[in-house]
């Protein structure tokens, strides 16, 4: 596994958003986040801190309409930056999972840096489709964020809400669980130094 910090830096500009992301997978949880959506900033901060990633996100988008494009496009760019940073995956554990409690809520994330993008989510209460946190973050965007992240990071990601009631707690537990699962998966495998696949490539 490389001794140099694994850093990904991606920019993406469309008619709907301008997103710039830099992530250091070998960081210490230093974050600089500004998306124009305060609750989303809070979630990305938690993602960086609990993943122990150094994370910089600067996003501007059409938030005067809603937060959808900014959140989804940030997930696209973050996923691409993670894929760039992890490189050929040599020496990583590849798999990671984490169960995270937050008061009445328990969420779980399972990840495989397989190179085969796939996303599954289950268990969020139906009312999260209609919930809005902080006046500008509809929790229906949780699924959009994690799906876009998985597809662009080229990982298999399962996000499961085992139980919970508060939309804030459920959302935050999901973000933190995903961060911790990714942190485990990209960590060094002390016993295997090559690419963690019988195919010899991921």
UniProtKB/Swiss-Prot annotation:
It is found in: Cytoplasm. CDD domains: IGPD. Pfam families: IGPD. Its EC number is 4.2.1.19. Pathway: Amino-acid biosynthesis; L-histidine biosynthesis; L-histidine from 5-phospho-alpha-D-ribose 1-diphosphate: step 6/9. One of its GO terms (cellular component) is cytoplasm. One of its GO terms (biological process) is L-histidine biosynthetic process. It is an enzyme of class 4 (lyase). HAMAP family: HisB (MF_00076). This is Imidazoleglycerol-phosphate dehydratase. The gene is hisB.
């Amino acid at each position: 596994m490389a001794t140099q910090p694994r850093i990904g830096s991606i920019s993406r500009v469309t008619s709907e958003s301008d997103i710039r992301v830099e992530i250091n997978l070998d960081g210490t949880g230093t974050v600089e986040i500004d998306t124009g959506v305060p609750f989303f900033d809070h979630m990305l901060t938690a993602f960086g801190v609990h993943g122990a990633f150094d994370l910089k996100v600067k996003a501007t988008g059409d938030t005067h309409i809603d937060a959808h494009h900014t959140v989804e496009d940030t997930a696209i760019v973050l996923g691409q930056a993670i894929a760039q940073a992890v490189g050929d995956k040599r020496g990583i554990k590849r798999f990671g999972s984490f169960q995270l409690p937050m008061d009445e809520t328990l969420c779980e994330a399972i990840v495989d840096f397989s190179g085969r993008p796939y996303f599954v989510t289950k268990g969020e209460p139906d009312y999260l489709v209609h919930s809005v946190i902080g006046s500008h973050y509809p929790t229906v965007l949780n699924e959009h964020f994690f799906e876009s992240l998985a597809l662009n990071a080229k990982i298999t990601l399962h996000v499961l809400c085992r139980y919970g009631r508060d939309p804030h707690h459920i959302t935050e537990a999901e973000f933190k669980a995903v961060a911790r699962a990714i942190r485990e998966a990209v960590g060094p495998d002390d016993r295997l130094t090559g690419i963690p696949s019988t195919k010899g490539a991921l």
